[in-house]
């Protein structure tokens, strides 16, 4: 079996001084101030990742100790940040396995530690055994983790807008990647997008609507989805937008 996230290798290479990462005495959860990192990471850079050669090589049991024979990950939160929405998914869908994928090493470390703390705190109920996080570059390695038609839902919440025109190719929604997403998303599955940047929202909608394998949900359909209200402030980035009274731009698409 291969390691799934490459965290240990990257941490060894960074050679950063050891820093205590104390948990909160009140909540028992890790404190984000000990895991701070720049807001975004270059997805094109040659990061060092340990990734599986094929989905069959992923050691899911190391992330989901209670996983059942034949059970698969159903939901993927791409660029999960500090894991707020991932935790919400675990609470809303206890019977489903959800994975958060994050490229930034300290941020993914925080989510891993947060999930471990939640599991310890809820040891008597077994809650949060259905969520996990791994560090990887989703723009490069998603097909290495998921088989065709595996995912029911994919989430792209507040992705890096890459404002400069020369960097638009780095946006996680583009025609080439949409075909990869369509490959791992089952027919009828949903792809959720949320941003506070109107230009990026228009870019997403244009590219999604131009792709033959997606159709946008109507406003009525989107509002009827029980997940929709959670998209606005379950994630840390979404909560910040709410605090700053910013705009939210939502678009949900169905895999045809």
Swiss-Prot record:
The keyword Transferase applies. Its EC number is 2.1.1.33. It is an enzyme of class 2 (transferase). GO terms for molecular function: tRNA (guanine(46)-N7)-methyltransferase activity; tRNA binding. It is found in: Nucleus. It catalyses: guanosine(46) in tRNA + S-adenosyl-L-methionine = N(7)-methylguanosine(46) in tRNA + S-adenosyl-L-homocysteine. Expressed in testis and ovary (at protein level). Ubiquitously expressed in all testicular cells throughout spermatogenesis. GO terms for biological process: RNA (guanine-N7)-methylation; tRNA methylation; tRNA modification. The active site is at residue 160. SUPFAM superfamilies: S-adenosyl-L-methionine-dependent methyltransferases (SSF53335). Its main location: nucleus. Residues 1-25 are annotated as: Disordered. Interacts with wuho. Belongs to the class I-like SAM-binding methyltransferase superfamily. TrmB family. NCBIfam families: tRNA (guanosine(46)-N7)-methyltransferase TrmB (TIGR00091). This is tRNA (guanine-N(7)-)-methyltransferase. It comes from Drosophila melanogaster (Fruit fly). The lineage of its organism: Eukaryota, Metazoa, Ecdysozoa, Arthropoda, Hexapoda.
């Amino acid at each position: 079996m291969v390691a799934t996230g490459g965290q240990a290798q990257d941490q060894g290479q960074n050679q950063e001084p050891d820093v205590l990462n104390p948990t909160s005495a009140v909540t028992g959860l890790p404190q984000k101030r000990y895991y701070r990192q720049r807001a975004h990471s270059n997805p094109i850079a040659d990061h060092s990742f340990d990734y599986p050669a094929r989905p069959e090589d992923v050691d899911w049991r190391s992330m989901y100790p209670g996983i059942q024979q034949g059970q698969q990950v159903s939901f993927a939160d791409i660029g999960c940040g500090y894991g707020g929405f991932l935790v919400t998914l675990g609470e809303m869908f206890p019977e489903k396995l959800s994975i958060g994928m994050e490229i930034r090493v300290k941020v993914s470390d925080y989510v891993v530690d947060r999930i471990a703390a939640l599991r310890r705190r809820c040891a008597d109920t077994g809650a949060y055994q259905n969520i996990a996080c791994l560090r990887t570059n989703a723009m490069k390695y998603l097909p290495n983790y998921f088989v065709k038609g595996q995912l029911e839902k994919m989430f792209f919440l507040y992705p890096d807008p890459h404002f400069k025109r020369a960097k638009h190719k780095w946006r996680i929604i583009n025609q080439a990647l949409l075909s990869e997403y369509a490959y791992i998303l089952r027919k009828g599955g949903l792809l959720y997008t949320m941003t506070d940047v109107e230009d990026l929202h228009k870019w997403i909608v244009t590219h999604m609507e131009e792709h033959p394998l997606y159709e946008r949900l109507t406003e009525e359909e989107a509002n009827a989805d029980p997940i929709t209200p959670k998209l606005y402030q379950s994630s840390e980035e979404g909560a910040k937008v709410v605090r700053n009274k910013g705009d939210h731009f939502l678009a949900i698409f169905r895999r045809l």
